[in-house]
Amino acid sequence: KKLKNSSKKFTFFYPGNINQKTGGYIYENNILKFSKKNKFPIKFIELTSNYPNPNIQDIKNLNKLTSNIKSDNILIFDGLVLEGLDKSTDIFDNFKIIALIHHPLYLEFKGKKSEFFFKRAVKIYKKINYFIVTSLSTKKLLSKTFHINSNKISIVEPGIEKFKIYKKTLSTKVKILSCGSIIERKKYDYLIKEVQNIENIQLHLVGDVSRESKYTSKIKKIISKNNLKSKVILHGKISQVKLEKLYSNCDFYISTSEYEGFGMALANAALSKLPIISYKTETIQKTIGKDGVLYFDNHNKDTLKNLIINNCFDNKKYKILKKNIKNKKYLTNDQSAKLFMKAIHNA
């Protein structure tokens, strides 16, 4: 069905470069492309990648931008930007606000830092008129933990399109792929330590290195200190073609993250018939199911190492895993973007 072009106008704020190949950016870039193609009235504005920790100048810039927007516009904030606005909540008083939450940020951290972001979210979420989330578990979390009326929350799952398949280059090494911003929540330090003493393995990490520069430095240090440059390849930002070639050339996809908003990269792996090793979470189980997946449920020393050694070097086991991957149905990019437009229009 054709989407009615709305008389409402929207301004969408997101942080950093939208062309990066990690879940949240792919999701938002899809909305941007769809809205341009269909002349849907959303203006996209790129803010600094400093969010969710903006400096004074960043806030001044945002205030300047919003002061030039008519008050009948509806503002859409990416969660990373939103949770950096605890000292500028007056922005929320002048406009109707929609928040796109991939997951609340307090889940990315432990201890005091987690508590800090949790309190921030409690304060900010109260001011929001409507929420869009990417999975049922995030909707449940917002309802239960933040006491948000579930009528104010829409689920719009991401579009997952089949990647182009390239000819696989033969290799004596088992190649493992993991995609996602280089941030603490992804637990790349644990992943590297678990694979560093396994022979004949190569780990490919794809993702934005600018989000948590301290953590990126930590990862680079682990790699150089242990002479792992040829074993752990840090790709940073790459093109779609290179990403598709990596999916075609790797043997397994791995995720060590304790929390995912949806798990787009894992869904891509499932569609690419790539066996998956993943930390067990409710969301991931819903996104990719259990066929062709090896789950683990703790980040203890040697848990992952043993799982890899016992499963990834046995051709018979590999073939069974690959054969078991079911054809899961995901939304296409257009279906996802259309649902997003419908949700903001009805918000």
Summary of predicted features, one role per range:
Residues 216-238:
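Nucleotide-activated donor-binding/catalytic signature segment of Leloir-type glycosyltransferases, i.e.
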